[in-house]
Amino acid sequence: MLGKGKIAALGFQHVLAMYAGAVIVPLLIGGALGFNGEEMTYLVSIDIFMCGIATLLQLTVNRFFGIGLPVVLGCAVQAIAPIILIGQDMGIGAIYGSIIVSGLFVLLIAPFFSKVVRFFPPVVTGSVVTVIGLTLIPVAINNLAGGEGAKDFGSMYNLGLGFGTLLLIILVYRFGQGFSKAIAVLIGLVGGSLFAALYKGISLGPVSEASWFHMPKPFYFGTPTFEWPAIITMILIALVSMVESTGVYFALSDISERKLTQKDLTRGYRAEGLAIMLGGVFNTFPYTAYSQNVGLVQLSGIKTRKVIYAAAGFLIVLGLIPKIGAVTTIIPTPVLGGAMVAMFGMVVAQGIKMLGKVNFTSQENLLIIACAVGVGLGVTVVPDLFNAFPSFVRLFTSNGIVAGSVTAITLNIIFNMIPHRKDKKVADPEPQHAK
């Protein structure tokens, strides 16, 4: 029987394991969209708060939602690039309108997703995640050099600070042990910021101006707007997140020695959809199950939900204290850029890892990957490629992630799902789901 002190300590460890990943999402998005200090403070604080709420939704089991596993929810990293692109092209309102609709979509398809999931084998999800990561790299390099439009863009100081942060992250990964490796990005951000503070100084104005307590405000950034290209993009991201969450659910069920049923998965997907909708209402981001916390459950051997309840409680309390959120907003742009290179590179690596499950003896699978990545990157590099087409077509070709996703899904159906006259080939293994 775990005492309250041990439960609190184990819960806080889960917070530390996911904190860097959770905080980096609002930092990168807010930085790319030019948010001021006050807006960034709110964005980080409400994000931490909503991570706690989203986690509670999964822990609490009732007829309608909650999978009841020791799962922690955090911001979906794969949503960073699409959100930045939507914000730059259509405005902040379109971001949150599309997030709300995508959450509603997840809620509605929850009972059917275990059947739909076969349309998203590794050849599709791996291609999509790879394209997402590749489209993020230019954002990272721009920030590493000082940020778009910076007067000292590309200066020796900015490049040294950015690459120095990246080097520190690499060294922690190389020589760190256990938990230190799990927070290598956080260590890099702290180390780079300390160097910048000692060398040039950092303004602590946002921290001193931030209040000690605040309450979350619905639609803080204004009324949401609903743009079809943005909505389609976020629905595709939600589907990819659901596939990834399914893997996390089954991993935790295996660790917990609990067999998942169709109803369990439906409640889990509903909780995720509700969390995404609330994220849109309170102006945060889509949520998904965090795999890094699965590793902690495995390493600690502690499978009780009490620990995750404690983690959710810590997240909610931290999110109500803006001064804590404000500390993360004073990180210099080149430091963020250095961390972005590692983070976004890891998104690419995750996509390649997912593609490792693909049957590469099939020429059809190679063609699916080639076309999906090629079309996705092509539209990213030349965004005006389809401007001459009707608006309906441009809904699916407005950005590289949507174009790459549609290409991968369509070609997978053609090559791997429609029966062929020739001998049956070995296709990808379908994502595991409950019978």
Predicted regions span which residues?
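The first (N-terminal) embedded transmembrane alpha-helix
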Residues: 11-28, 72-79
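Hydrophobic, membrane-embedded alpha-helices of multi-pass small-molecule transporters
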Residues: 5-18, 22, 154-166, 184, ...
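Short, non-helical or kinked segments that cap or interrupt transmembrane helices
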Residues: 42, 64-77, 118-127, 181-186, ...
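Intrinsically disordered, low-complexity non-transmembrane regions of multi-pass membrane transporters
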Residues: 1-10, 204-219, 254-258, 268, ...
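Short juxtamembrane and helix-loop transition motifs at transmembrane-helix boundaries
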Residues: 2-9, 30-39, 55-65, 85-94, ...
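Membrane-embedded helical hairpins/re-entrant loop segments and their flanking transmembrane helices
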Residues: 4, 30-66, 233-305, 428
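Membrane-embedded alpha-helical modules
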Residues: 86-203, 312, 317-425
